[in-house]
Amino acid sequence: MPLILGPIKIMNNILTIKDLCLNIRSNNHQDEKVLKNISFNIKESEIVSLIGESGSGKSLTALSIIRLLEKSCEIKSGEIIFLNKNILSLEEREMRSIRKNDISMIFQEPMRSLNPVMNIREQIKEAYQKKSSINLEQEIINNLISVGIDDAKRVINLYPHQLSGGMKQRVMIAMAIANKPKLLIADEPTTSLDVTIQKQVLDLLVEIKHKLNMSILFITHDLAVASQISDRIVVMRNGKIVENSESKKFFNSPDHSYSKSLLISSDYNKKIDHHICSSDNPILEIKNLKVYYKEKNNFFFKPDTYIKAVDDVCITLNPGMTHAIVGESGSGKSTIAKAIMGLASIKSGSISILNKNIVKMRGSSQRDFRKNYQMIFQDPFSSLNPRMRVGSIIKEGLCFLKPEINKYEIDKILSDVMIKVGLNQDSLSKYPHQFSGGQRQRIAIARVLILEPKLLICDEPTSSLDVTVQKQVLDLLVDIQTKTNIAYLFISHDIKLIANISDTMSIMNKGKIVESGKTSDIMNNANNQYTKKLLSSVPAIIK
């Protein structure tokens, strides 16, 4: 009896890019080729991950698809075919219709994409312009719940500045999928999210793909995330595509040497096993710290209510050691850093550095003591003054806290610290915008190291960096610790990454430390259910 086969469904290409070339005109009116003969396609209901370092051309490729390039960018040649139409030849009116109904994009920095003077309800309503107002409120709430915002009824009344970074990104995702587009472009959508929320968002994208038959162009530098959801991997380097293969093949046997180096960098492990012991002279000792924020009250005579951002937290950190604070957005981990730096009001408790309670310090004594503890922020570009040259940025703190040092000594110290962080002397005369993300973070590290602090607070210092650059920055921090015996307080939502460089760890949830101890003990034998949930949500490369 002959075998009768059912009809085979042929997956059509929803997007085809052919030989796309793009130039950027610099200030001296010279053209620089940034996209060089880019060609790839995306099939119906397919997830394609576009991978590469900063400056490789990933985001420019995405912006070319939706024609939102800056005026300095010019597409010199090539085609972008979407639903059998060449996007590059469409009038702007037609393009606006496509952006509204057929192609949506989630941007990496949600704060720049959300309107600061509109509440979340009004912003999501814009995505539903053509829909009836009947049950619209409930649909908005359901949409927010689907992206992991459980208290959606409260969130729709808030403004962007009242949300954490992860919450803002979830709102952006809710807006992007509101009209059920045929193609969703996601530019680093999970970079700022905690592992549990990241898993929810990835699961959601896969679910939407199947439910709506939607295609996704997923731009990321996290190979583990890409392996979780991708059907195909496209690797970019210096404006060119160096590899285009099925996900399983890519993660098992990549063809290009650059792809192989990315996979090696993603498996970061440069842990130094310190002998952990108690000390009579800890660098940092936090006892029963409480930081409460008063909630906004719109009713007369209603008693005040407080958000317990940090509730009875205790941490001890010894010289030359690294302690990690891990938790989701809103867990209170960054509030601890703010409290140490004097940027958050403390309700009760003590923070001692070098056996001195800094909570009680005021005026010049506080200023003079500040050189002993410094902080590296999550976004190096925002923390560097764009109008100052790098040399002035790095030496500013030294000149302020040590006014007795002469110019010759400052120049010598400046030269030494540049060597220490791996930057050349020519960098001193440049401005922050002339550097990559990894280089800017090195500048931020140099700015604090020049003061020779005993304690460095690192608030998500690598979360916005590519895997190779991330590895370089972490290598740098580990090497500096080995040479100087500096102590690190690392704040992160990436428990897998932080486990490779920390000696001890505290897990935070809703303002409280739910588990604390040696990193190896927590990673191998966690006791708390919340810790187990975090560990189970960590993405691993699927081969």
Regions found by a protein language model. Name each.
Residues 244-245, 253, 516-517:
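ABC ATPase "signature
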Residues 226-228, 498-500:
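A short, surface-exposed alpha-helical micro-motif characterized by mixed small hydrophobic
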Residues 87-104, 130, 248-254, 299-304, ...:
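ABC ATPase NBD coupling module
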Residues 74-86, 349-357:
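Conserved ABC transporter NBD signature motif
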Residues 137-154, 408-426, 536:
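Conserved ABC ATPase "signature" region
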Residues 178-182, 450-454:
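A short, proline-enriched helix->beta-strand linker immediately N-terminal to the Walker B motif
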